[in-house]
Amino acid sequence: MRRPFIAGNWKLHKTSAEAAALVGELKGALSDVVDRDIVVAPVFTSLAAVIATLEKSDISVAAQNCYPENQGAFTGEVSPALLKDAGCRYVIVGHSERRQLFAESDAFINRKVKAVIDAGLSAILCIGETLEEREADKTFDVLERQVRCGLEGLDAAAMEQIVVAYEPVWAIGTGKTATDSQAQQAHSFIRSLVNDIFGSKVAQQVRIVYGGSVKPGNVDGLLQQPDIDGALVGGASLNAEDFIRIVKFKAV
């Protein structure tokens, strides 16, 4: 049985004080939730405040990005080693906004994945198709390319440090959500790819989560699907009440 994984990606929101207040509320409300992994991903400038507030809590912290070198003349960048030193456990890699706004390639994303794993952190590898790609029936082609490129060079042991997040680009920040069956179909395909690359044991162990306008009103249906192991939550994670409800999803 795969342990559910719920992560909140705050993107470019929340001052340090606001971030600390939010996780303080989450820490109290979710202290009794012990059967799933809970993660928050604040902006870099709020990491210290969030990590300090979450001391003695089971809620983990992720960074939203990294650079795939540990040190050097890379002005403005942050390495996985420094993120680990700060107290992070996860790094989001390959988010569609990084791919689209900053032209990050599959090969560059693969470098990040390897760097995160080498630093002893876990990577949340984001993949997903655009609306144009879905309408052109290229969804599976895109997912296969992103999975194979993103995981290239990894072995079965490294896959223990990977969470795959399927985020259909057309459903991010648009209010649109993939139907339960659309999401399950994509997740099942992704798991079949992992099976093809690493074998059935890894495929059955790897967690594949859904991201794309996850809200309290749709999380229960999504998390009832057999291959959906959690959620990467965007806007709804900025509201304590909404995120708490999502973490406490009622899948049956």
From Swiss-Prot:
Its main location: cytoplasm. GO terms for molecular function: triose-phosphate isomerase activity. InterPro entries: Aldolase_TIM, TIM_sf, TrioseP_Isoase_bac/euk, Triosephosphate_isomerase, Triosephosphate_isomerase_AS. It is found in: Cytoplasm. It comes from the Bacteria. One of its GO terms (cellular component) is cytosol. It catalyses: D-glyceraldehyde 3-phosphate = dihydroxyacetone phosphate. Substrate binds at residues 9-11, 173, 213, 234-235. SUPFAM superfamilies: Triosephosphate isomerase (TIM). GO terms for biological process: gluconeogenesis; glyceraldehyde-3-phosphate biosynthetic process; glycerol catabolic process; glycolytic process. NCBIfam families: tim. Homodimer. HAMAP family: TIM_B. Involved in the gluconeogenesis. Catalyzes stereospecifically the conversion of dihydroxyacetone phosphate (DHAP) to D-glyceraldehyde-3-phosphate (G3P). This is Triosephosphate isomerase. It comes from Syntrophotalea carbinolica (strain DSM 2380 / NBRC 103641 / GraBd1). The gene is tpiA.
